[in-house]
């Protein structure tokens, strides 16, 4: 991870439940707003409209005061972040003495910030001024979009967030084929059998239909892949 964070742990999306129920509808919405296209970098030699996506990286972050995640981008096609617990309010962070000589809109304490270039090449940013109203909210964005998590202050509680990356399944073997460490996924034959039973169906128009399978989502404290 790029972050200077206290703790991060990998998660398992059992039966691809979160991927199907949360991620695929957002992928479909993105495609419908972008002429059926994904935000693909030009070095990807695959057809995005016939190559399935997979949630191959999923992890939870525990951020404490002064922890931060500098500007970075992720691998894959799409990324997301979900704020599960936010112990601070941006308005309260703005009142801290070290920020009083800074224009209020430029006070970044406790914010999540995107950075991008506009049509003229200028560097622009968009900040989420986080507080408890953002708990259980999700941002879903192109993996190549630069973003940062700024530090917060004045509390010993952790901010808890979940993040993940969606990649193309270029092997046809699901997460097993894409995994950097396939041994983490257990028995190959059993995994591929389960994947086939839970496979989503592609309709040829940019959408994947959801399979009817048992809906479970478990957390396992394993080391996440680097981004």
Predicted feature residues:
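Non-heme Fe(II)/2-oxoglutarate
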Residues: 1-69, 108-111
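Proline-rich intrinsically disordered, low-complexity coils
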Residues: 25, 39, 48, 52, ...
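Secondary-structure transition/capping residues
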Residues: 34-38, 91, 173
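Catalytic core of non-heme Fe(II) oxygenases with the double-stranded beta-helix
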Residues: 56-140, 145-150, 156-161, 172
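Catalytic core of Fe(II)/2-oxoglutarate
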Residues: 118-198, 202-205, 212-226
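Intrinsic disorder/low-structure terminal segments
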Residues: 8, 17, 42, 79-82, ...
């Amino acid at each position: 991870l790029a972050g200077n964070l206290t703790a991060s742990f990998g998660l398992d999306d059992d039966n691809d439940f979160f991927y199907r129920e949360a991620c695929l509808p957002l992928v479909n919405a993105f495609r419908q707003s972008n002429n059926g296209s994904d935000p693909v970098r030009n070095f990807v030699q695959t057809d995005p409209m016939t190559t399935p996506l997979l949630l191959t990286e999923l992890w939870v972050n525990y951020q404490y005061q002064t922890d931060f995640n500098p500007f970075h981008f992720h691998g894959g096609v799409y990324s997301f972040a979900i704020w599960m617990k936010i112990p601070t309010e941006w308005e309260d962070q703005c009142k801290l003495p070290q920020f009083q000589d800074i224009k209020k809109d430029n006070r970044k304490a406790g914010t999540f910030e995107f950075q991008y270039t506009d049509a003229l090449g200028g560097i622009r940013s968009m900040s989420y001024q986080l507080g408890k109203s953002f708990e259980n909210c999700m941002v879903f964005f192109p993996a190549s979009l630069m973003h940062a998590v700024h530090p917060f202050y004045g509390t010993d509680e952790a901010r808890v967030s979940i993040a993940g990356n969606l990649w193309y399944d270029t092997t046809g073997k699901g997460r097993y084929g894409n995994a950097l460490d396939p041994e983490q996924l257990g028995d190959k034959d059993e995994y591929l059998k389960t994947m086939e039973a839970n496979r989503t169906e592609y309709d040829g128009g940019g959408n994947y239909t959801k399979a009817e399978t048992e809906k479970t989502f478990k957390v396992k404290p394993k080391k996440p892949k680097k981004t």
